Amino acid sequence: MRFFNTASGIKEEFSKDSKKLGLYICGPTVYSETHLGHAKSYVSFDILKRWLTYKGYHVTHIQNFTDVSDETAKGALREGVDEFTFTQKYEKEFLDNMALLSNTYASKYTRASEFVGKIAEETKKLLESGEAYQTDQGVFVRINQDDHGKLLRVNLEESLAEGTSDVDSGPKESPHDTLLWGPPLEGGNSWEVDGLPPGRPGWHLECTIMSSSELDLPIDIHWGGIDLIYPHHETEMILAEKIGLGHYCDFWMHNGLMEDAEGKLSKSRSERVSLSQIFEECPPASLRFYLLTHHYRAFTPYTPDSLLRACQEAEKLGINAVDCMVVDPTDPRDDDELAPLVSRFENALADDLDTPAAMNVLRDLDVIAGNRIKQNGNLAPISGMYSIFECVLGLFS
């Protein structure tokens, strides 16, 4: 099987000697409702995980929650509650929505707040080694021009133009230096650690510490949206090297974002399309269906009309599926009419998770299923084929 590796910019053969895999996906910063962009990212990742499991791998899936950030502190202050009381509300809302979308649960969910001690320890080591420096706005790590570009594959000036982060603001020696330990924030929790001023951990180091604490290195596959390539994933990888972790990750995979009729949905516009709003008009299973009709790396168009059409098609395709899946399944590979469909389906997923091609197989299966139902034909292998779609794509659950 071949996956697109952001680090190389090409599809690469994915082959491991061990059947045990470690996968890490950057989780949400839990300060607002789960939105359409979240659905795109986590459904796409779920297909990867399901496919690898189907192929016989034993997957350890780690996902974090960023529960210490500028946004969580501001939200807690706004609502007049403790920061962790605030974030736990949105953690639950996120997990409830992921379950509605039929996403599988992570092997373990980590929280930035649980790793503050380790983050502080590594920050102090970087200060002692001279890799980091302290200002009145926090502790920053020095990042040189040559450190960047392993994921973006551009030079310093170009990567600076790609994006900035509020988390990285402050009196820095270089624009690319990144915050390791920031000052206390109104509304947020802070920690007192010997050797550091009272404060809070920085975003990028949080993920480096959480992932390396829970998974053997190198991580087999690290996933996130393309908006996380820079500065987050670039910096996460650099920090892993600076704290002595060595080669951090073998495969970096990134999903595209959502876009509307005017073009790419910005983060703020995407967040305004909450899943609770969408689920009032469209069942979660239909949204999952819609997302799978687009490749994970592509920008996925969103309009209410396009989603409505997907709902209608998903409902139509589900009719024959329900009728067939009441029959005990047999292996569709033993059925001359279905064996080619199994091959097409598996080849599609093996080619960088080509779910649009896999969905075309589903449409062809629907035709065959309809004919056999009319002719009182053998539905057992049809049921088996639908079970594969249920297992790998999370449809018809």
Segments from the language model and where they lie:
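Alpha-helical recognition segments enriched in aromatics with Gly/Pro capping
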Residues: 1-31, 46, 117-323
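N-terminal, positively charged nucleic-acid-binding surface of large information/translation enzymes
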Residues: 8-104
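Short glycine/serine- and small hydrophobic-enriched flexible loop segments
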Residues: 50, 212-213, 367
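Short catalytic-loop micro-motif centered on adjacent basic/acidic residues
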Residues: 61-62, 106-110, 222-224, 380
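Short, glycine/charge-rich beta-strand/loop segments that flank catalytic centers
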Residues: 65-69, 91-94, 104-119, 137-146
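The substrate-binding groove and active-site-proximal loops of carbohydrate-active enzymes
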Residues: 76-83, 107-113, 197, 225
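Structural preference for alpha-helix termini/caps and helix-kink/transition segments
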Residues: 264-267, 271-397
